[in-house]
UniProtKB/Swiss-Prot annotation:
Pfam families: Hexapep_GlmU, NTP_transferase. InterPro entries: ADP-Glc_PPase, ADP_Glu_pyroP_CS, GlgC_bac, GlmU/GlgC-like_hexapep, NTP_transferase_dom, Nucleotide-diphossugar_trans, Trimer_LpxA-like_sf. Pathway: Glycan biosynthesis; glycogen biosynthesis. It comes from Paracidovorax citrulli (strain AAC00-1). GO terms for molecular function: ATP binding; glucose-1-phosphate adenylyltransferase activity. This is Glucose-1-phosphate adenylyltransferase.
């Protein structure tokens, strides 16, 4: 059914990500690294491509250079099939010297792209979440129900409703109310006293309906899908709620959390989502050959491990672990961990070094940091707050280049008997190397 429809995807990747500061001090939210070699934006793009949706515009805005470079290096599709593309679209200011004023305004400012492509359906998706989704199943639902607009939904706790667009439906999944980030708890969803139905920020529009709605919203000064466009369409159009819980992904293991979806818009949520991917039976398995999450081509050498103990950790390519201890650690590419250093529940980003005897726990080390020998981070939070960002739950974030790196290349420790890590170490399963 859905294969007969011409689908254009528009991914809204302009989010500033202020709640992820300082990780977003130099990059936009979709460009923030995730796991051993991915960025957050890779999840929505992989879902679209795996769903055989190959015509994708990526709308960017804030601090977008690293995202643009990532797309150029990782998501360049064939030049010989015109409708296969992932194209970055910065603000064009076609309607005046203004940046995007909201989600709907970002699409309106690029309305010419929709008009020239002439799709049947426009998929307007966010770029801020960790999940797998077969978008074709949502398209089938959209077509089967003669929907003008379909909104992907899932249950959230009532206490968290002020972070989401909340929908109310009738018995046939038609949306009868839509409130963006309500300040008072909404009515629970049918069959639950503790949860309401929330929008995932993923929408399907019939193209003609979307074009009319965007033009009308522009005339009235409305700029946001959740705040303005969707509530205004309730009486005049058929809006349907797609139940994300019904979405099935091939290759999902029985131990994985069904319908895993995480909004990683805060440091705490971002940190926890990493550890959902670790271990032999993770909540969310990064490797699935039937539904891969694509990453940039890896030109680095294999990781090298000499002695030390590694438990339930990821060691990125080009990294060196020399007689150190890793417990629930996530090392991205080209990280060096020197002898007698210890990392516990840590995320360490590219080209960082953990000096000899340093101890770090419950921390995120942004890229290009040279942690001094015998440094202690995460053990005295009051002292850490004077230097770093520390969340209410005690997660320490060391900003990019806080510890100015010296020449990482010239001081890389020599490992005469270095061994490449086994593949599973860089893909998320635990690895223990005995001394």
């Amino acid at each position: 059914m859905s294969s007969t429809k011409n689908v254009l995807a528009i991914v809204m990747a302009g989010g500033e990500g202020s709640r992820l500061h300082p990780l977003t001090a130099e990059r936009c939210k979709p460009a923030v690294p995730f796991n051993g070699k991915h960025r957050i934006v890779d999840f929505v793009l992989s879902n679209l491509v795996n769903s055989e949706i190959y015509s994708i515009y990526l709308l960017v805005q804030y601090k977008s250079q690293s995202l643009i470079e990532h797309i150029r290096q990782s998501w360049t599709m064939t030049r010989f099939i015109p409708q296969h593309f992932v194209t970055v679209v910065p603000p064009q200011m076609r309607n005046g010297p203004e940046w995007f004023q909201g989600t709907a305004d970002s699409v309106y400012q690029n309305i010419h792209l929709i008009e020239s492509f002439k799709p049947d359906i426009v998929a307007v998706f966010g770029a801020d979440h960790i999940y797998r989704m077969d978008v074709r199943q949502m398209i089938d639902f959209h077509v089967k129900n003669d929907a003008h607009v379909s909104v992907a939904t899932l249950p959230v706790k009532l206490a968290d409703c002020n972070q989401f667009g909340i929908v109310e439906t009738d018995d046939n999944h038609r949306i009868v109310d839509f409130v963006e980030k309500p300040q008072t708890p909404p009515r629970p969803m049918p069959g639950s006293s503790t949860h309401a139905l929330a929008s995932m920020g993923n929408y399907l529009f019939n193209a003609d309906i979307l074009l009319d709605a965007l033009r009308e919203a522009h005339e009235t000064g409305h700029s946001d899908f959740g705040k303005h466009i969707l509530p205004a369409m309730l009486k005049s159009h058929r809006l349907m709620a797609y139940d994300f819980d019904t979405n099935t992904i091939p290759g999902t293991e029985p131990y994985e959390e069904h319908g895993y979806w995480r909004d990683v818009g805060t440091i705490d949520a971002y940190y926890q989502a990493h550890f959902d991917t670790l271990g032999a039976t993770p909540r969310f398995r990064m490797t699935n050959r039937h539904w891969p999450i694509y990453a940039s081509p890896d030109q680095a050498e294999s990781a090298q491990i000499e002695n030390g103990v590694i438990h339930r950790s990821v060691v990125g390519s080009g990294s060196i672990v020399d007689g150190a201890s890793l417990d629930n650690a996530m090392l991205r590419r080209s990280v060096v961990v020197e002898r007698d250093a210890r990392l516990e529940h840590c995320i360490v980003m590219e080209r960082s070094r953990i000096g000899r005897g340093a101890q770090v726990r419950r921390a995120i080390i942004d890229q290009d940091n040279d942690i001094p020998a015998h440094e202690r981070i995460g053990f005295d939070l009051e002292a850490d707050r004077k230097r770093f960002h520390v969340t209410a739950s005690g997660i320490v974030v060391v900003p990019r280049q806080f510890f100015k790196p010296q020449s990482l290349q010239s001081t890389t420790p020599s490992i005469g008997r270095a061994r490449p890590s086994v593949a599973s170490a860089s893909e998320g399963s635990g690895l223990k190397v005995a001394a």
